[in-house]
Amino acid sequence: MTESGRIPLWLVATVAGMGVITLLGIFFYGAYAGLGSAV
């Protein structure tokens, strides 16, 4: 792989994937917590 001062694609994909998983986790946790407290 030739790096020309750019951010590696795998690093971008990893950070983006972790961000999406974190957002999904927070969203589902918030929905579950809200559901549990509402019932």
Curated annotation (Swiss-Prot):
Cellular component GO terms held in the UniProt record: photosystem II reaction center; plasma membrane-derived thylakoid membrane
Main location: membrane
Keywords associated with the record: Membrane, Photosynthesis, Photosystem II, Reaction center, Thylakoid, Transmembrane, Transmembrane helix
Localisation: Cellular thylakoid membrane
Record Pfam families: PsbJ
Highest taxon, organism lineage: Bacteria
Protein family membership: Belongs to the PsbJ family.
PANTHER family in the cross-refs: PHOTOSYSTEM II REACTION CENTER PROTEIN J
Record-given protein name: Photosystem II reaction center protein J
Organism per entry: Cyanothece sp. (strain PCC 7425 / ATCC 29141)
Gene designation per UniProt: psbJ
